[in-house]
């Protein structure tokens, strides 16, 4: 399960369904979940291509990469993709992918996220940056945060883990080094927040997270976009293409502008951290 990605999918289906209904048309969705497996992404994309669908929505970086590599004649909209230039290997990315690809980005304001570390853990002299090395978007976010911290005179060190096998050991290293820990928007982290929490909470090390789903599992606070709204935005782009003949090659990547400061009440209490009044409590989702 990956709550953020599921929210984006639901937003997409709701928005496109509504736009189609308004136009007196119906839309059929073929929902396939690759569970973050690259080989499954490739297989699913192959099936979509063979069925000659009108549009492919690719949720998350691995899905977008698989679709963009295999399909050139069907419009592809990405969502929950952090940095399209990094994901698709485009040098000097200017905001528009071109060809048959566009979509929405879940990139948060990284400077503001970095500043949160300094605001909430003012005594922090060293910050550990924990992320999955298999995700290029995570590396991008971590470098930006490190740059900001360095300019503020705060030391940081990267703690990349390869997969779930070494996550616990690497998280332990991060918790031993850092006065605080930053984890970016990262699919592997999102699926393994319990492991990270089990290591870091007993050591009383606060984690600032790139998005709400991760923060709800192991963080103290986040500046998070709404993945549902990101999906809605993607669905509206799909409607422009399918109903109004918009040219996807000219559509710039869109960003969500509804980011909110949120906090995990349980972990903040456990670590004795008080957040400013403008922070909104993360509601635990019913299992």
Spans of model-derived segments:
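Extracytoplasmic "Venus flytrap"
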Residues: 1-14, 30-39, 188
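Hydrophobic alpha-helical segments within soluble ligand-binding/sensing domains
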Residues: 84-126, 225-246
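Hinge/cleft segment of the Venus flytrap/periplasmic-binding protein
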Residues: 240-287
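An alpha-beta-alpha
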Residues: 12, 102-150, 247, 251-267
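Pocket-lining segment of extracytoplasmic ligand-binding domains
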Residues: 136-211
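Extracytoplasmic/secreted envelope proteins and their assembly/folding machinery
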Residues: 9, 13, 41-45, 53, ...
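Beta-alpha junction/loop-to-helix N-cap segments that form part of ligand/metal-binding clefts
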Residues: 34-91, 186-210
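Structural motif
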Residues: 26-50, 160-175
